[in-house]
Regions:
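An acidic, glycine-rich "communication" segment
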Residues: 23-26, 50-56, 142-241, 251-256, ...
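Bacterial N-terminal signal peptides
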Residues: 5-17
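Loop/turn elements at helix/coil->beta-strand transitions in domains of secreted/extracellular proteins
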Residues: 38-41, 101-106, 129-134, 177-178, ...
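Short alpha-beta junction capping motif
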Residues: 42, 105-157, 163
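Aromatic-Pro/Gly-enriched surface loop or interdomain linker
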Residues: 19-105, 109-112, 234-235, 241-269
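Surface-exposed patches in mature extracellular/periplasmic domains of secreted proteins
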Residues: 83-94, 136-139, 176-185
Length: 269
């Protein structure tokens, strides 16, 4: 208990300290990847996106928040653990790149804009079956108006239409896959920080509760969690904007706790 309390204090202190840094977001720029060196490197997955998946400033759907969100999360990881993760160097890797299999954990966002190719489906299947852990974030049901769909998206397209697009794509990856709604009793919410309630997780959008779903090996909740899904929220937005003062520190703390737990779980399972 004392260790967890100390870590919570360290997390709050670290989040407060991040306020001195500038925030996002100018034109999109993709940075060179670093070679694998055995040190933990956060990996973001690149993918083929459908119509409407290119946003303001040339940001592709897969790239929102890159690399600042994960850089801030890695600063927190190094504050509360001895992981010694790379902080400034964030790798953005295509599913078709064999280098992906050197990394046990990968992060992907805005998956309802994903126009999954056959090669991407096959690569993701192999990655998961070989033990890779995938964190999915930042997508929601389609809504009308300013916050609905993508900026300049095609209203006649299924892309940007929330869960149904992603679920259909995952049936191409693992045809028997069944996502299970998770509650706070799941081990992933207790691997480092004790997250006893999910109804306090901040909402990055404009309505509804965040929904947490998991994909388990053989669809058995007693087996390995292969994919963790944050639906109807954008946890990484709190990491990304934590240096701006635009998000409450308490909410940002909860988002960082999730990120830390996800990484610890992925690295130990």
């Amino acid at each position: 208990m004392r260790v967890l309390t100390a870590c919570s204090v360290a997390l709050l202190t670290a989040v407060t300290a991040l306020a001195q840094f500038g925030g996002p977001r100018g034109p999109f720029h993709e940075y060179p990847n670093i070679p694998y060196d055995g040190q933990f490197t956060f990996v973001r997955l690149k993918y083929t996106h459908g119509p409407g998946g290119n946003w303001y400033g040339g940001w592709p759907a897969w790239g929102h928040g890159y690399p600042l969100a994960e850089q801030n999360l890695m600063k927190i990881m190094n504050e509360v653990s001895f992981m010694n993760a790379h902080v400034d160097e964030i790798n953005a890797i295509s599913l078709e790149d064999p280098a992906l299999f050197r990394y046990p954990l990968a992060y992907i966002i805005e998956v309802d804009w994903w126009a999954m190719t056959d090669r991407e489906a096959a690569a993701l299947r192999e990655y998961i079956q070989k033990g890779g852990f995938v964190i999915v974030d930042d997508f929601k049901p389609r809504r009308r108006g300013r916050f609905g769909g993508g900026f300049g998206g095609d209203e006649g397209s299924d892309y940007g239409n929330g869960w149904s697009v992603f679920e259909a794509a995952m049936k191409r990856v693992l045809p028997e896959s069944k996502f299970i709604d998770l509650d706070a009793s799941q081990p992933i919410f207790h691997t480092f920080f004790e997250i006893d309630r999910l109804d306090i997780i901040p909402q990055a959008y404009i309505q509804g509760q965040p929904i947490f779903r998991g994909l388990f090996e053989d669809n058995d909740p007693k087996k390995r969690l292969q994919m963790m899904v944050n639906y109807n929220t954008d946890v990484s937005q709190f990491w990304e904007w934590s240096g701006t003062g635009l998000r409450a520190i308490d909410d940002t703390n909860e988002a960082y706790k999730l990120g830390v737990n996800y990484i610890i779980y992925g690295m130990t399972h």
